[in-house]
């Protein structure tokens, strides 16, 4: 057992050296948030990344918590094309749950495990200027990112904090917007020009003919979408990945957040456990 431990450390060493001082944006959601064991493992992984000299920036979701509170209040959640239809009352609930509960729970868990986290949302420091998402008609206060101001994030990283970001943006008139967490993570990753964007999902990665694809170029990822090989919720995640790598992010990783220590297994091992998207042509 001791020799196995040494071997694991030796395998991780070149990656620790390579990524020391680099910034990763990690989208935390899905199974990793719902499964308590996976959640605790993720928090421990995060703190370990920080202690190895990597700068993690967390963007979180919280859809199940929002729906749970809505149901308790007698409000039925309604979705259109994967987006939560967000009227004024729903927007209040979304902001209350994401900013007031989910964000602070994550921050406290990181701090309890030896990290130093600060929770913010897109309104803080004018981080996420948003505008109404109209692609699928009027779906209420659902937004898309218009501009990212990374000043606050950079300041927190310099001071040694782990930023934890709730995906609530603000309009030019001060209106609050609910924004998809994958999109927020990708836009922040692009603005910071980070080393890695990691998207935690409920599946092991991207599949073709029943087989996990460990690595894809952005062109190959585009082909999978165009040929209808990937479907459902994986399409917007791949679109985020393609946009990120085409805008300067070195690589994007789509991994199963329900697997304990998925983050470390993907980043610090040769094989990884999910799908990595990068510009292989460069």
From Swiss-Prot:
PANTHER family: N-ACETYLGLUTAMATE SYNTHASE (PTHR23342), N-ACETYLGLUTAMATE SYNTHASE, MITOCHONDRIAL (PTHR23342:SF0). One of its GO terms (molecular function) is acetylglutamate kinase activity. This is Acetylglutamate kinase. It comes from the Bacteria. Its EC number is 2.7.2.8. The record marks 27, 237 as: Transition state stabilizer. The gene is argB. Catalyzes the ATP-dependent phosphorylation of N-acetyl-L-glutamate. One of its GO terms (biological process) is arginine biosynthetic process via ornithine. It is found in: Cytoplasm. It holds the Pfam family AA_kinase.
């Amino acid at each position: 057992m001791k020799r196995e431990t040494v071997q694991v450390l030796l395998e991780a060493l070149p990656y620790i050296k390579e990524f020391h001082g680099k910034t990763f944006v990690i989208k935390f959601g899905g199974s990793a948030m719902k499964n308590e064991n996976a959640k605790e493992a993720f928090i421990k992984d995060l703190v370990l990344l920080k202690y190895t000299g990597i700068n993690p920036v967390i963007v979180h979701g919280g859809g199940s918590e929002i729906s749970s509170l809505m149901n308790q209040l007698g409000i039925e959640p309604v979705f259109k094309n994967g987006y939560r239809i967000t009227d004024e009352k729903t927007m209040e609930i979304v902001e209350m749950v994401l900013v007031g509960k989910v964000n602070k729970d994550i921050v406290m868990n990181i701090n309890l495990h030896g990290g130093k986290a600060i929770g913010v949302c897109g309104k803080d420091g004018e981080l996420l200027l948003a505008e109404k998402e109209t692609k699928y008609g009027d779906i209420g206060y659902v937004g898309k990112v218009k501009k990212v101001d990374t000043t606050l994030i950079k300041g927190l990283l310099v001071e040694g904090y782990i930023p934890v970001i709730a995906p609530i943006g603000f309009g030019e008139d001060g209106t609050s917007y609910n924004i998809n967490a994958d999109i927020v993570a990708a836009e922040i990753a692009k603005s910071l020009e980070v080393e890695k964007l990691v998207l935690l999902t409920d599946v092991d990665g991207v599949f073709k003919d029943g087989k996990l694809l460990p690595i894809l170029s952005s062109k190959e990822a585009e082909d999978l979408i165009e040929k209808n090989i990937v479907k459902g919720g994986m399409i917007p995640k791949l679109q985020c990945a393609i946009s990120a790598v085409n805008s300067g992010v070195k690589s994007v990783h789509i991994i199963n957040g329900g697997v304990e220590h998925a983050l470390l297994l993907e980043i610090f091992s040769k094989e990884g456990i999910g799908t990595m998207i990068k510009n292989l042509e460069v």
